[in-house]
């Protein structure tokens, strides 16, 4: 399956450690969304915005990798899944369930 990574999941070392089967495919800009930081964790999120884009990357991931990401992203409590199409292929990413106010990102970003 295709996965769109943004925020801290762009760290290739971290992705490979967490998702052993993951394969980086390419840089990708998700149009019609913008990057935001929310929640008490000051974690990355994306939200619709027709004039913006989110820098990220496309990865091929296994079902096992998806399950590991679900745990890491606290799915479905903190994040839910968003699907979009890229060249007739379905791509999955995560967006926050509760859209809290903007918070400055953590140092690791």
Walk through the language-model features, giving the residues of each.
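Glycine-aromatic micro-motifs
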Residues: 1-109
């Amino acid at each position: 399956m295709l996965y769109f990574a943004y925020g801290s999941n762009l760290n290739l070392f971290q992705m490979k450690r967490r998702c052993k089967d993951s394969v980086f495919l390419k840089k990708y800009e998700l149009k019609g969304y913008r990057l935001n930081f929310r929640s008490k964790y000051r974690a990355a999120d994306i939200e619709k915005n027709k004039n913006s884009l989110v820098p990220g990357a496309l990865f091929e991931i296994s079902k096992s990798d998806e399950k590991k990401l679900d745990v890491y992203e606290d799915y479905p409590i903190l994040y839910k899944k968003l699907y979009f199409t890229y060249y007739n292929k379905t791509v999955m990413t995560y967006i926050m369930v509760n859209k809290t106010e903007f918070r400055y990102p953590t140092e690791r970003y």
